[in-house]
Amino acid sequence: MIRIAIDVMGGDFGPDVAIPGAAKALERHNDVTFLLYGQKSKCDPILAQYPALREKSVFHDCEVSVSMDEKPSQALRRGRYVSSMWRAIEAVKLGEADVAVSAGNTGALMAMAKFCLRTMARVERPAIAGIWPTLKGESIVLDVGATIGADSQQLLDFALMGGAMARALFDIDRPTVGLLNVGVEEVKGQEEVREAGRLIREADLGTIDYRGFVEGDDIGKGTVDVVVTEGFTGNIALKAAEGTARQITTLLREAISRSFFAKIGYILAKSAFDVLREKMDPRKVNGGVFLGLNGIVIKSHGGTDAIGFASAVDVGYDMVHNGLTAKIENDLKIYHARRLPPPAPEALVADEE
C-alpha cells in the first residue's frame, strides 16, 4: 500500500482542487491511502462529497497554511511544524507517508523540504525535474527552478538523478541524457556547461547514455530522454513552452471562429484537434519532482484544476512504486565509489600483515 501525504491547503484553490484531484487519482490506484493535511472547517464539506476518498484517508487538522506570495524564509519561520505544507513533508520524514504532494508556494515548499528531509549524502543542491511532452512521447527536464547557476559538478549530479528518474518513470534501462547548450559543438557555451560535459563523459556512467550537448528545440523533438540544465535557464524554457502552448490554443480558437467554413472544417477535423489538445494539455504532465532529497516531494502547478492535481499524485505514485529514491542513492553510490582514489601500496601491505 502506497501512502500519499497531501498539503490540501496549497495552491490557488486549496481544497477545492486538492480533494477532487486526490479522488480522481484514487480511481486509478486502488492500492493507496491518503494523509490529508488542511483546515478541517474548510475541508470537511468538500471531503463529504467523496466518500470513497474519505474511506481511504486520514485527515489531520492544520489551522496554519502557507500563502502563494509568502517568502520562503517567512513561511519556514511561521509554518515549521504546524502548517499543512510542513506536516505533509514531515510525514515522509517520519515514515508515515511515502511521498508528499503540494500545489503550494514553490520556494516555501523547497525550503521546507530541504530543512525537513535534508539533501542526500554528497548531493550539493536539489533539483526540480519536470515532465515534458515531446514528439516521441515524454522527456524529463531538470533543473526547472531550484538551483540558479549550478556548477559543473552539480550538473553532473542532475544528470545522474534525472537518469534515475527516467528509469523509474519510463522503464528505460539506460536513458539518453543531453546538456542544454547554445549549440551542439563542444567549444560552445559557458565554461560550467563545457566542464560538466567533460565530467559526465569521463565518468563513463553506466546508468545513462550521454549524448553531448542539445539545443532548445531538441527538448520538444524528444532527442534525448533527459535534458540537463541549471534552474534559471530551465525555468525560462518551461514557462516559454507553457506560454507557446496557450498561444497556439488561442490562435486556433480564433481561426476556427473566424468564418462559417472554418467552423465546418473544425467539425470535420474534430478528432484530430482532440488528439492535439490532449497532447498539449499541461495538466497531463503536471507534477515536478524534487530530486536529491531524503524523500520524495511532488510540486503541482498552483493554478491547476483537479485533473492536473491528479496527474501530480500519479507522478508521486509512480516514483514510489518504481523506487526512485533507492535508484538515485544507488547511482550516486556507484559514481562516488569510482571517484575514490586507489589505496596506497603501503596500505595494501599493512592489510596483508
UniProtKB/Swiss-Prot annotation:
The keyword Lipid metabolism applies. It catalyses: a fatty acyl-[ACP] + phosphate = an acyl phosphate + holo-[ACP]. Belongs to the PlsX family. Transmembrane segments: none annotated. It comes from the Bacteria. This is Phosphate acyltransferase. Signal peptide: none annotated. It comes from Agrobacterium fabrum (strain C58 / ATCC 33970). NCBIfam families: plsX (TIGR00182). It is found in: Cytoplasm.
